[in-house]
């Protein structure tokens, strides 16, 4: 049937901020869904609190509510926008949970759910209802029991036995789940799982550890047509969350008989659950010996795996699911890549490998052991002609300095221990075991990874050990290595290792070129080349191909520009950079220039098949970039939008005289080189904090003594503030140097950067655009947290509350830097205002993570403006094209936007609740995974909204726990007095209690954990604490860390700096005032 005409206003619920388990994949699916609904003529209304997403750009929906995703807000939008139907299946667990809460409160009267009805959501998400539905249709399930209390859980474990898996209903990314091997572990896991489930329901089931795990991406329409889009196999056996597992498509160790059983079961499950207009993900486990197949769970929505399946096959699951939700059937929908009906099941003639990206180095105390609760921050995908080619390409894509199967250890006992323990480096330890002569069967007993995968790694190791310089003149051998996925850099490294002969990657490339060994570029076309592909979505392979290679036909010379993406999501480089790359592609379209996108992240909008004119899915390594440049003969390359990843390639690109457009490499080099940049600032007479570069440990002590404490130290060439610390005295410096030199050598090549730390300074971020002649100061973002907390973790807002004199100076200095550097495009400058003086902290001649937020706040697409400037080098023209009404200031070559009449605030979102053992205290090393935006008529209300959106709601009354470090106590007492005046009660441990008492602020003294019972943890567990204020630091004792862990565990809202408390007080003082719920389009009128 054609599209429905009985509905017109459709509300799409987004997934909110990037968190572990819900990342860019929902921006990809949401953007695709918004575009589809709009193209079909529906009025689209969106709610999503994440400003870094493409889907929240005003042009993708008619009304865009960047507001907290709460039942109350959704109900207000339903009434205000006269919503006919809600599409909740594109917003992950957040959207499903929101509509379930609304249903339970009776808030969905007269509104239809599209894609999945309430009954289907309940059956799919409620583990008891799912079990009953599966038993009804004869599906085998793991033996299990449900529990709603800790007592029922204990009864269940007596029946199930150990080891047992505990799973919580209606949670994201395995939240609250785990494997218990004994009663003590079980009791803690059961309590946590009951707390994590919004309906206090948990499932205790028999352990399936060691079983093989598979996922089926299924689509069903209203005519009961069903297709399997993709079958994904987990290399890691059951026991590791599928989001943390290395996965492959198509499945490689599944017999056709098993596949058909799984396919039939998937269709039967969708029919029983009631998913009749959309996509779902169904997970199975198969015993490797008995072949018993059990159903694990299903998601009645588009999921993380759906995004992977879409990118792996080229089949646009989110678009098709959206069209099915509004009435179409599969045979009525056209596959955009081949122009064949969407009812054709995709067929793959290549192998896809996904590897997760972790950030354990950022969180001391967090175990890197993987289990049923997800821990990864991002992922990469690689495509190859065979398994090993795809696997090695994926390893190279992770950007953690692995060139392939790097050797990690020669200690066999240590290696065996690491193979037993699921962890991000397990495959590399398996390779090390094979290097030491361990057989496949012995490795299998340690890890339960299928023997076929293990034998492939063993084969790779055998080949590696035979690599020597003779391959450089032997075409057959060299082609064979490239066919197995060996990068030029890895071949060079193995020649050095095996022969002690220095060979550079360039020499390997030259040898390849002389022997005419170049990659073939093949298409992802959903049909194994059976039909002609109309949209170029390409990957490289050295695998032999019986078909002729795809030619890069160019009827006439069209201008083309290559955009180098940002690679895997990680802390410090997230969705904000992908947003900028997407905008670059859209801006090139406006210029009638062909865009070529290059990335390896399957979650993102940039790797959607219709974002750019040509898409290359490849590791972001110089070897791959060079081959694409040579193939495409591009007229320009953009390296400034993907964060540090493409910027690191700029030097090699400049050497080969590649056409980098925008800010040239020599400018990037000045900004990135500490000594060159300090000289540059001296020439311009711009103040920066006292600093020095220590090239040895002794030099570090002498520089610190000259500068004076406190100091901030950081090694060179690290991302996201890794190993960066604030040190108060010589003893702390000594301890730091002793610990950091274990991880990093301080030398002339790797100096330690030492700066004077400006205490109590106000930090600012400035984003600007320059064309070498004029400058556009897009925004001055004021940080709430003081200097010393990484800018990516600090809340910031616009317009600034600083004096006009300081703001004028910031604009003047920013313009001076941009023009004298010779920036063409975006740049980001960080300043600190200390004792009324302006200091420059750093300059990044690239897009920053604040660009998407600022673009939303101003209504100006900054990345598009910058792209146009990079191509045309005409700032005035670019602003006129994209910002017809907003420029108000022009003086001395400086443009300024009209400041908003509202306050827009960006707040960071952290993964602490997913990473057990992490500490919520912030510092110079970045820890946040995502962000939210609060928009309101005042700073206090914007902050109030942002805290609600980032799961840290501000309470209006109750008991506040206060723990203040000594140096903050005097200032804190003044603020605490205001909290008491607002009606709050305070409680504190002895030191803070005495300080409050001395200042005349009433508080209840509570015991520390080590002082007896009942203590502060008991109060938290009993739900008596409404909020916590803790300004301790990482140097505080274990007792304080346990208290902070209790804050997280018991979902207590918390605040960790005095500057945040000042804004919290504003929020509390204004929270009783009504603030109308407005769409972004209304704010920008």
UniProtKB/Swiss-Prot annotation:
Annotated positions binding Mn(2+) 4: 842, 844
EC nos: 6.3.4.16, 6.3.5.5
GO CC terms: cytoplasm
Binding site for ATP 2: 714, 756, 758, 763, 788-791, 830, 842
Pathway info: Amino-acid biosynthesis; L-arginine biosynthesis; carbamoyl phosphate from bicarbonate: step 1/1; Pyrimidine metabolism; UMP biosynthesis via de novo pathway; (S)-dihydroorotate from bicarbonate: step 1/3
Binding site for Mn(2+) 2: 297, 299
Keywords carried by this UniProt record: Amino-acid biosynthesis, Arginine biosynthesis, ATP-binding, Ligase, Magnesium, Manganese, Metal-binding, Nucleotide-binding, Pyrimidine biosynthesis, Repeat
The MGS-like domain, residue ranges: 952-1085
GO MF term list: ATP binding; carbamoyl-phosphate synthase (ammonia) activity; carbamoyl-phosphate synthase (glutamine-hydrolyzing) activity; metal ion binding
Cofactor: Mg(2+); Mn(2+)
Positions of Mn(2+) 1 binding: 283, 297
Membership in a protein family: Belongs to the CarB family.
Function of the molecule: Large subunit of the glutamine-dependent carbamoyl phosphate synthetase (CPSase). CPSase catalyzes the formation of carbamoyl phosphate from the ammonia moiety of glutamine, carbonate, and phosphate donated by ATP, constituting the first step of 2 biosynthetic pathways, one leading to arginine and/or urea and the other to pyrimidine nucleotides.
Domain notes: The large subunit is composed of 2 ATP-grasp domains that are involved in binding the 2 ATP molecules needed for carbamoyl phosphate synthesis. The N-terminal ATP-grasp domain (referred to as the carboxyphosphate synthetic component) catalyzes the ATP-dependent phosphorylation of hydrogencarbonate to carboxyphosphate and the subsequent nucleophilic attack by ammonia to form a carbamate intermediate.
Description of how the protein assembles with itself and partners: Composed of two chains; the small (or glutamine) chain promotes the hydrolysis of glutamine to ammonia, which is used by the large (or ammonia) chain to synthesize carbamoyl phosphate. Tetramer of heterodimers (alpha,beta)4.
UniProt protein name: Carbamoyl phosphate synthase large chain
Phylogenetic placement of the source organism: Bacteria, Pseudomonadati, Campylobacterota, Epsilonproteobacteria, Campylobacterales
Gene: carB
